Amino acid sequence: MKLYRTFIALILFSFGVGALQAQTPTTSSQAQDCGHFVQQFYNWYAATENASMKRNSPGSALEVTLREKRSSFSPELLKGLKEDLAASKKSPGEIVGLDFDPFLNAQDIAERYLVGKITPKGDHYWVEVFGVWNGQKHSNPDVVPELAFENGHWIFTNFHYGKTGIPVNENLLSVLQGLKKD
């Protein structure tokens, strides 16, 4: 009888573990899903930016993005970007706030963008994004978005630009905070 109970307990335990594993995506599948989200965003954003340039309306891609893709950004990042955009609109003709594209870490747009290495860091993922210029992928990432999976979807929480001699310029949140102080 004792052997029978042990056998039944093992069967129930194995079904329970299997069900839990089926509900929890693996780190590998999460990373792939995250990378797919980032690639889709950059495909959309590059097309939006190109359309803005053709209309001779630089900067409007950021406005369109904040309007149409706001659910893709953390509240902190969205607030900082909206505040920066509002400050720059108050002083047309002057460079106020961000003087580069915060999602591309550039002033010009590449032909296209490719997702590279995806690195889990705690409950966030850092995704390398490379610009392709004249058919050649940059050897170093142009930008490294940081993402989290919240409320059933991916959101950008920051954009990293690499090490510089000025640490405040190494990521979008710190750049926005520095500009707000100025």
Question: Where do the protein language model's features map onto the residues?
Answer:
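Bacterial Sec-dependent signal peptides at the C-terminal "C-region" and cleavage site
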Residues: 17-26
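Bacterial N-terminal signal peptides
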Residues: 8-18
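Surface-exposed patches in mature extracellular/periplasmic domains of secreted proteins
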Residues: 49-58
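Surface-exposed, charged secondary-structure patches
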Residues: 24, 70-136
